[in-house]
From Swiss-Prot:
It catalyses: N(6)-[(R)-lipoyl]-L-lysyl-[protein] + 2-oxoglutarate + H(+) = N(6)-[(R)-S(8)-succinyldihydrolipoyl]-L-lysyl-[protein] + CO2. It comes from Rickettsia prowazekii (strain Madrid E). The lineage of its organism: Bacteria, Pseudomonadati, Pseudomonadota, Alphaproteobacteria, Rickettsiales. PANTHER family: 2-OXOADIPATE DEHYDROGENASE COMPLEX COMPONENT E1, 2-OXOGLUTARATE DEHYDROGENASE. One of its GO terms (biological process) is tricarboxylic acid cycle. SMART domains: Transket_pyr. It comes from the Bacteria. This is 2-oxoglutarate dehydrogenase E1 component. Pfam families: 2-oxogl_dehyd_N, E1_dh, OxoGdeHyase_C, Transket_pyr. Coiled coil: none annotated.
Amino acid sequence: MEEYFNKTGYLFSGNAVFVEELYRQYLANPNSVDQTWQEFFADIKDNNVVLNKSTAKVISTNVTNKELLNNNLSSETLNNLKAKEMISAYRRNAHYLANLDPLGLEIRKTKNDLKLNIEAFGLDSSQLGENINIMDEFIGTWNCKLSELVTKLDKVYTSSIGVEFDQIENVEEKNWLYTKLETDITFTSEEKKSILNDLVEVECFEQFLHIKFPGAKRFSIEGGDASIVAMNKAIDLSMHQGVEEIVIGMAHRGRLNTLTKVVGKPYKEVIASFINGNIFPDGLNVSGDVKYHLGYSADRVRANQKIHLSLADNPSHLEAINSIVAGKVRAKQDIFVDTKRSKIKAILVHGDAAFCGQGVVAESLSMSPLTAYNVGGILHFVINNQLGFTANAADTRASRYSTEFAKIISAPILHVNGDDIEAVLKATDIAVEYRQKFSKDVVVEIICYRKYGHNEGDEPMYTQSKMYNIIKSKPTPGSIYANELVKNGIIDNNYYAKLKEKFKIRLDQEYEQAKSYKQETHFFEGYWKGISRIRGKDAITGVNKKILQDLGTKLCEIPKDFAINPKLIRLFEVRKTTLTTDQPIDWATAEQLAFAHLLCSGINIRLTGQDSARGTFSHRHSILHNQIDDTTYIPLNNLSKTQAKYEVANSNLSEYAALGFEYGYSLANPKNLVLWEAQFGDFANGAQIIFDQFISSSATKWLRMSGLVVLLPHAFEGQGPEHSSARLERFLQLAAEENMYITYPTTPASIFHLLRRQILESTRKPLIVMSPKSLLRHKYAVSKLDELGENTTFIPILDEVTKIDTNNVTKVILCSGKVYYDLFAMRTNNSNIVIIRLEQLYPFEKKLVASLLKKYNKAQAFIWCQEEPKNMGAWHYIATHLNDALKEAEINNEFKYVGREESASPAVGSLQVHNKQQEKLLMEALGDDIIKEKLY
């Protein structure tokens, strides 16, 4: 190849990328390139030379491109080649020249810095009048003077929009984007006036609140006004494209304007929350939340077209809402069978510091193209006000842009100056159309500023005096645009002031109405109609035994031409025999039967998690894989022609975003059973924000209910500190106001009833399950089919299973989970110790526990036994409840703790030490009634 470079100077340095691209084009279609290039490339092929920039030897030289050009090419062809290279270079790098900072603080690079001056391409000023004539499937069609080409490129790529499309691998997408960007967009005079009116309403509402409620936190959008107008534009464009619903997720910055101007919440309702502080009607007995965390839903109607808009409730934990919105959108798409994912879409609004600082952004983006999580692309707006509270951009990222994460999914990124509203709307137009056409994520970063501090009571001059001295005297985006319209003769000098005055009058009227406004509820509507906030009677969750046997048998029938793994053949044979001969069933079978009957009752089920399709412990096998080809078979989707859908999928290696997605999915329809399973319960704390800010508290903060099921494998089995504990204590600490169910079931019957209760009861509450590991195959951890049969239900507390004379009972042990089977196995046959299991820890059923304890009122000792260290597990939560139950049972005694000592780590790393600890707690719990021969 070096020989060819030596002979052909035009293949050096700056031309290399172009020539390589041209060569690929030639390989696809030789006639698509100039005759000269055809001859050259043919020669390369004949000599078996491979043109590949990853392997080609780089040759350095000090001579200029002009000196290297081969004289065999005509000057016109050479100029066209150079121009094509210049166009490509502008497309790749000119975003560094774009005027993106409305404050003018950025020191911009020059054309010389980026080698975008014409001399860098072997051209000079004497050639500016020469014609350029390019027809190329990658570059497009250009027929103009060189000077006009330079002017056009400067206008498109170095004005108020800078683009990064080079990370996109799909050539069609990339060419489409460049063509759209290089095509002028025009607004009529009326459209320009409408844009100005939008800016006025955004600006005036913020100023109105600032004057009426000085010092009140509202997290103003002033300085980033264009983002609200852009969202409005995106919604209108989407409506015209046939989108019927949009779910929006955003943080607190600009939220009040989004609620009113974008989503359609009455101004008086927002103002009333400032006046009286109420966000919900009296008497609901909920905690509520601050006004800039609240969501809202409404319909927007334009010219006989309607679109439903929802702004999701969210906490101050930035970017936490991302995957939740995606999950909610996916659920709605599934409800309406929007398989093209074109009718329902998501808009996410980010802050610059958060977008590049919060890891959940990368988690959520990575999920976006995956089959189980794809929503047809999300439109992202990044409001870059160049600060993160008090931190400068240089403190929060190393790159120029805050949007680098988006490149991991090859998303197009458009950076735009927030003071150029028409440029913002052009970028929005391109982004909306791209998402709808290609069904992929797209990012619009609006570079703007923040008029006040992080909130209106904060003083930014302490830390950003230079920036805020500029901001103090800076005209608003609305006034900048108004002056532009005056200059162009579209409005007169008084038009802008009149618009502001007119809108202020409206806000004054809204303010007066707000004084007497009574907050209304907009909850439990649509699919949630009929769902109760309060627990009703226990649902009967049992199913006719014959029906269960038939369903179980059907699940074991695999098509004859499907090459199933031989080990699974045996599993299904045993399972089928167990069912048909009415033998006790294991956990996996009970779960499958619960799913099967729900599916045949029209209930859709979605189960995701790391390795959930097979199951971490190889117990589920929801998806069977053909051993000959790549086909799969899902027994739960082959029960009946009229059944509902069972969707099971392995998630990406994420807890935070993955759990958030399923929580969001559960919000859309209470008639879906939605489950997320951790690989091990220990890893659930990677999603702690979802548990703390959403699952445990959304009902009392926002009146948003969820029936999500969370399966967390938990048990102390000598596997070390990261494979033992789902941190049960943390969930119990979150438990209050009957906000969720926390269970540690020990029988297949329990999980069967728990799963069915989630759908059959009148309310919806999250279900946290400390699910089994070794118990999946434990010989005693089985249930009779009668325990799942008609008129049966979930039993939160299980009494002693052996017959013991209550008058002879000396000790009562209460426990939860796997330790029960250890105690049961180690207890002597003639023991006077009873072992009682709490299958449900929260809500604590005090009356049931008390009535059971009363049976054993002659016992001298009452023990709570757990595997977890004393500072973990259920002890600190349950001790008071147990002693209260003793009082209610009129037993003058107290529960004593038996378990591991306090520890900073959940479990030891040594199996030998684990066994000694387990032996100690069993001996302490059982005393002389232990079978010593069975000790470790």
